[in-house]
Regions:
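A glycine- and small-residue-enriched flexible loop/hinge signal that marks low-structured segments
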Residues: 2-372, 376, 381, 388-396, ...
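Generic hydrophobic alpha-helical scaffold/packing signal
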Residues: 386-389, 423
Length: 440
């Protein structure tokens, strides 16, 4: 019989033999997470209902027709182009439910909405085999799918339609008809979106409505998730007059478009949401140039702009013909000993949210229910947290970081750990220059 062998946890083996454990030197797995994630609902006339679906900027550019029903440059996708100007991933949601699908005797549109009325089905005898049929799906007159089959039962659903099973016969083109959009988008539609988006993680939430009651709904959702659930993100909303909170950014400039009529005046919220989501943790949008497609109302005097800043308004203004962000601020107005002026800066909130979110992920994936709450376990947690903050120091999001300001101690119960970071210096971008020149 072979001698004993294998791995060991305690020195309690009976058989003589060789027992060995191999392991690596413990290394902190703490890393800074990427930004660029936004969540937003859209009024669409194509796409799935009542579900959140992530779309990357690459998907948007290459596959927008399949996902949203239109090519990238189509006027119908203006809100999506605005948010994707700087966001890398958007959790999209189609507002409303009950859109009617367009149909004919050959096929039914994959999704409800008026876009289905632009679909046509053609049937032609195959030129090589007279027992086969070429069945094509066209959108705006362009072929998007062709299948060669002997009978309609052999047709496979594509990105645009599901097929019925009539007897095939030649037809130059049968349009789908009867597609209708949702009759009304209201507060319930937005509440349904908020219910669906709650479990997701993102940097910025977009509220694309001018209705004050619905804006307040988004405000309450944001404050609840930030303060009670611990999900750290900021809300971008249109003129949130009652907001006084570092987690809410209020957009006030009205928007129009040079060639697209009936653009909602609040449409700028999409661009701001994407820009705030895509802004790096060590950067600011102060003086950032607007590079979307909208025409913004920037007819403000210096006195009006100063008053707007004091009121916590996120404003754009004219700088030598360019449209730029006046200052990257949120709606926080009421200051206190524990929440001072620095919390009015969105750059500060990005740093705070980065620490909160990354520490939460670190704890949940490495420590929760796994690492003993003893001195060694807390020392490991301390090491990971200090590594996170040191990473922020390395990219100049914070400065003069001393690991000694971080403590991890036994909490009030055996399973609790109390971590305190006392005296962290957050860096903000330069915004004002005061200069004295003395001439002799």
């Amino acid at each position: 019989m072979a001698l004993g062998g294998g791995t060991w946890q305690t020195q309690n083996k009976v058989l003589p033999g060789y027992y060995v454990n191999f392991s690596s030197v413990p290394r902190a797995s703490a890393t800074l997470s990427d930004r660029g994630y936004a969540a937003a609902p859209f009024e669409l006339n194509w796409g799935p209902e009542e579900q959140v679906f992530p779309v990357t900027s690459g998907d948007m550019q290459k596959n927008s027709k399949t996902i949203f029903g239109y090519g990238y440059t189509d006027p119908a996708l203006l809100p999506l182009r605005e948010i994707f100007t700087h966001a890398t991933t958007v959790y999209c949601y189609r507002l409303g439910k009950g859109a009617v699908k367009a149909t004919n005797d050959l096929a039914t549109a994959k999704y409800g909405g008026t876009r289905g009325n632009d679909i046509t089905i053609t049937v032609a005898a195959n030129v090589d085999e007279d027992t086969l049929w070429d069945v094509s799906t066209l959108v705006d007159g362009a072929v998007v799918d062709t299948q060669t089959v002997a009978k309609s039962a052999d047709l496979i659903a594509n990105d645009w339609v599901t097929f019925k099973t009539p007897t095939l016969e030649a037809t130059a083109g049968k349009p789908l008809e009867g597609g209708e959009n949702v009759s009304a988008i209201n507060g319930e539609s937005h509440q349904a979106f908020l219910d669906k988006i709650e479990p997701y993680s993102y940097n910025v939430l977009c509220c694309p409505t001018a209705d004050p009651t619905t804006v307040k709904l988004y405000q309450q959702f944001t404050s609840r998730l930030r303060d009670e659930v611990g999900s750290k993100f900021q809300l971008v909303a249109w003129q949130p007059t009652t907001a006084d909170y570092e987690g809410i950014i209020g957009v006030w400039n009205k928007a129009t478009h040079s060639s697209i009529s009936s653009v909602p005046e609040h449409l700028l919220v999409y661009w701001v949401a994407g820009a705030e989501a895509g802004c790096a943790v060590n950067k600011s949008l102060t003086n950032f140039k607007y590079d979307g497609e909208l025409t913004l109302d920037i007819n403000y005097t210096q006195a009006e702009l100063e008053a707007a800043l004091k009121a916590g308004k996120f404003m754009f203004h004219n700088v030598n013909g360019d449209v730029r962000v006046l200052e990257d601020i949120n709606t926080l107005l009421t200051l206190s000993d524990t929440k001072g002026e620095i919390f009015q800066s969105n750059q500060t909130i990005r740093v705070c949210d980065q620490i909160a979110n990354d520490t939460a992920v670190l704890f949940a994936t490495k420590y929760l229910g796994t690492v003993p709450n003893d001195a060694s376990g807390r020392a490991s947690l301390w090491g990971d947290i200090t590594k996170l903050i040191q990473s922020l120091n390395d990219i100049r999001a914070v400065e003069n970081f001393d690991p000694e300001i971080v403590t991890c101690e036994q909490g009030d119960t055996k399973k609790a750990v109390l971590c305190i970071v006392n005296g962290l210096n957050v860096v903000n971008a330069m915004a004002q220059l005061y200069m004295s020149v003395i001439i002799q």
